[in-house]
Amino acid sequence: MLNNIDALMIYNSPDIVDEREWGFYLGYFAKGTKETDANNCMIVEMRTIGNITTKKYAHGENASFLYTWSERENYEYDFPLKNI
């Protein structure tokens, strides 16, 4: 399984990391906002299955700060809708 340092190397400096038994949630907040604000976060779910790591985004939105960090477990995660 990836550790925090590996996750940071894959994604440039997330604002917050939530490590779970199965992987990580990484949060990126819109400039000038914080963890407790609503609808300001891009959330990435990283899971390691064997030697493969998947990177999925809340509803596949990989360039939008539409989500709330405290609701991260309630979103569906999918592969990116567009390349950035």
How does the language model describe each region?
Residues 2-84:
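Intrinsically disordered, compositionally biased low-complexity regions
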